[in-house]
């Protein structure tokens, strides 16, 4: 009997549109001979509803206009150990789901919120648990923990919105330029800026606080951006390393999803020694933060060969431009095989 996979996409975060694009690739890749599919769109206001396989996203291939198609039926969630997890309001039917494949990026999707919801309905889901998801989403907390395992991370100053005005003058005196200002719990480079002087620093702080009540100020690292994919539960494997080359001073939202000038080089043109070291650190970070199923780990590699772990993404992108599936493709696991592998890892997770 075929198992039923529910794909969740959309969400309330700033990365709503990226999630929609990722869902297209995943839905196309799921083996329909092996699995039944239920498409669940999460609207920007948080409403959850079933979408038709024939009409689930409008303006699919335009990042500026892409949006969820109207729901076929909104859903109630049924908590507890039940045979059914969702109730359809339109046709009054209960839905049984065996696996949840959530591609909800960012806050209230990648930060443990929905992972906790999945736990309340006792349904296995692709990705890390509540704790790991929450930690990895918070750049400040994840860096503190990774440091205790001897992993080099970019040093940072943490500012909280409620009291930063009392500390800002003292902090500014200790900052060297250029520096990078970023929200602690956002993805896709939302709210991230590089400051070269005190005026741009204060402006960048104000922008970052629009996205989060906690922000980080880091020294700007002049280096190459190297990324590696991690896959597994107890037996963790890593992909080849990839490098992202871009025109701007840093890899911002436009460079990630709009610019056609960004280049992805796989495998990265680095020595075997550096490559193996980065892959080893990626797996150590994945295990140290108790991640599971999948993650993309991002690094900076400086001219003098210093390696800094930048961040861990527990729900990496799956768009046509995303590096995570490309890394695995170059490692011998094509897109459809990768999606099937992720589902099987979830089903047989212990």
Curated annotation (Swiss-Prot):
* Chain positions recorded as ATP binding sites: 172-227
An example Gene Ontology molecular-function term: D-alanine-D-alanine ligase activity
Q: Which GO terms describe its cellular component?
A: cytosol
Question: What Enzyme Commission number does this protein have?
Answer: 6.3.2.4
Localization per Swiss-Prot or TrEMBL: Cytoplasm
Pathway(s) per entry: Cell wall biogenesis; peptidoglycan biosynthesis
Swiss-Prot/TrEMBL catalytic activity: 2 D-alanine + ATP = D-alanyl-D-alanine + ADP + phosphate + H(+)
| Cofactor binding annotation | Binds 2 magnesium or manganese ions per subunit.
State the needed cofactors, names only.
Mg(2+); Mn(2+)
Residues that hold Mg(2+) 2 according to the record: 311, 313
Q: Which InterPro entries match?
A: ATP-grasp, ATP_grasp_subdomain_1, D-Ala_lig_Van_CS, D_ala_D_ala, Dala_Dala_lig_C, Dala_Dala_lig_N, PreATP-grasp_dom_sf
State its role.
Answer: Cell wall formation.
Similarity remark: Belongs to the D-alanine--D-alanine ligase family.
* Family annotation (NCBIfam families): D_ala_D_alaTIGR, PRK01966.1-4
User: What's the protein called, per UniProt?
Assistant: D-alanine--D-alanine ligase
């Amino acid at each position: 009997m075929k198992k039923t996979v529910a794909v969740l996409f959309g969400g309330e975060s700033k990365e709503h549109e990226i999630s929609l694009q990722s869902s297209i690739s995943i839905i196309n890749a799921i083996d329909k001979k092996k699995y039944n599919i239920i498409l669940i769109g999460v609207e920007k206001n948080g409403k959850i509803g079933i979408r038709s396989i024939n009409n689930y996203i409008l303006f699919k291939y335009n990042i500026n206009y892409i949006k969820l198609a109207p729901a076929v039926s909104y859903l109630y969630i049924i908590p507890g150990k039940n045979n059914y997890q969702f109730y359809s309001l339109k046709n009054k039917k209960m839905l049984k789901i065996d696996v949840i494949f959530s591609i909800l990026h960012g806050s209230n999707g990648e930060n443990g919120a929905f992972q906790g919801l999945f736990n309340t309905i006792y349904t296995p889901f692709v990705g890390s648990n509540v704790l790991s998801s929450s930690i990895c989403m918070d750049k400040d907390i994840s860096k503190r923990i990774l440091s205790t395992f001897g992993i080099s991370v970019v040093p940072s100053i943490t500012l909280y919105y409620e009291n930063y005005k009392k500390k800002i003058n003292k902090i500014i005196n200790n900052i060297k330029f250029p520096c990078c200002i970023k929200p602690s719990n956002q993805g896709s480079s939302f709210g991230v800026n590089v400051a070269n002087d005190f005026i741009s620093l204060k402006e960048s702080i104000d922008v970052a606080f629009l996205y989060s009540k906690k922000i980080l100020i880091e020294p700007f690292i002049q280096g190459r951006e190297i990324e590696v994919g991690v896959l597994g539960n107890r037996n963790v494997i890593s992909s080849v390393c990839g490098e992202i080359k871009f025109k701007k001073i840093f890899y911002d939202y436009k460079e990630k999803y709009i610019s056609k000038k960004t280049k992805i080089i796989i495998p990265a043109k680095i020595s075997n020694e550096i490559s193996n070291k980065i892959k080893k650190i990626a797996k150590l970070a994945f295990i140290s933060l108790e991640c599971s199923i999948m993650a993309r780990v991002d690094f900076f590699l400086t001219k003098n060969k210093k390696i800094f772990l930048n961040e861990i993404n527990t729900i990496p992108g799956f768009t046509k431009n995303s590096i995570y599936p490309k890394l695995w493709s170059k490692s011998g696991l094509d897109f459809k095989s990768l999606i099937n592998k992720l589902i099987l890892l979830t089903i047989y997770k212990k």
